[in-house]
A protein has these predicted regions:
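Positively charged n-region of N-terminal signal peptides that target proteins for export
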Residues: 1-5
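Residues that act as N-cap/strand-start positions at coil-to-secondary-structure junctions
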Residues: 30-32
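C-terminal motif of bacterial Sec signal peptides marking the signal peptidase cleavage site
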Residues: 14-15
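Structural signature of tandem-repeat unit edges
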Residues: 35-45, 53-71, 81-94, 104-117, ...
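Consensus positions within tandem repeat domains that build extended binding/scaffold surfaces
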Residues: 74-76, 96-99, 119-121, 141-144, ...
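Bacterial Sec signal peptide processing site at the extreme N-terminus
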Residues: 18-27
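Short secondary-structure subsegments characteristic of cysteine-rich extracellular domains
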Residues: 10, 77-80
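Short, aromatic/basic amphipathic alpha-helical patches
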Residues: 212-213, 228-240
């Protein structure tokens, strides 16, 4: 069952219910953008779409019709070019593929620590400058930040174990990243075209990594002195001790 949330329509329905029976208390109004579509899934709610004309700041409600919002669906906010800031409630546990892809004006978004995985979620968000991936997330899927060419600062949570194909492809403003010791694999072209990237600091053992992970990028790799599995290079890039970091 899909709905279009509309404050005007919602107020109208309340008025109609009140006219039918003055004994029935109207439902409490939902403070939410009028442009969201959602779907009831059992005891929970999934946000399925946002009007592409939406602009400025948007707050996703934690509850709709008395049920928690737990999911942001695939392509839900894709190509909402006018949105600059989105607040996601802590009730959300799942964010679908491409959920915020091509939100070209988006500069600020917080991933709640209830989410466990992201994939192609923010691709081509060309105005996004910084983001924190919470400790609840265990994987950064393929193309998650592809083409986010304004992204300068990223904090990767301590539970991430894998970085997928093209995850940071052409993030041309990134200069340095710290990789937590939880990361065990980095897939193909994960950092391709990150031509400003000069330093990757690894806090754990050497991960399994695709040979082309740093294609068209020239970072120096820094590692902990007591970490295992390291050689003089990683995917063709020089490896040094953290103590040698400038």
């Amino acid at each position: 069952m899909k709905h279009l949330i509309s404050l005007l329509a919602f107020s109208f329905l309340i008025g109609c219910d009140a006219e039918k029976s003055n004994k029935t208390k109207p439902p409490e109004a939902i403070s939410v953008s009028p442009n969201l579509k959602y779907e009831i899934k059992g005891d929970a709610v999934a946000i399925t779409r946002c009007d592409k004309k939406a602009s400025g700041e948007l707050i996703i409600p934690a509850n709709i019709e008395g049920k928690p919002v737990t999911e942001i669906g695939t392509f839900a906010f894709s190509s909402c070019y006018g949105l600059t800031s989105i607040t996601i409630p802590d009730s959300v546990t799942s964010i679908g593929d491409d959920a915020f892809a091509r939100c070209a004006s988006l500069t600020s978004i917080t991933i709640p620590d209830s989410v466990t995985s992201i994939e192609s979620t923010f691709s081509l968000c060309v105005s996004l400058t910084s983001i924190t991936i919470p400790d609840s997330v265990t994987s950064i899927g393929e193309m998650t930040f592809l083409g986010c060419n304004s992204l300068k600062n990223i904090t990767i949570g301590n539970s991430v174990t894998s970085i997928g194909d093209y995850a940071f492809l052409r993030c041309t403003s990134l200069t340095s990243i710290t990789i937590p010791d939880s990361v065990t694999s980095i897939d193909k072209q994960a950092f391709k075209g990150c031509n400003s990237l000069t330093a990757l600091t690894f806090l754990g053992d050497a991960p399994e990594i695709a040979n082309d992970a740093f294609e068209q990028s020239s970072p120096t790799i820094y590692r902990e002195p007591d970490a295992k599995g390291w050689g003089d290079t990683l995917a063709g890039r020089p490896v040094k001790l953290i103590t040698e970091k400038p």
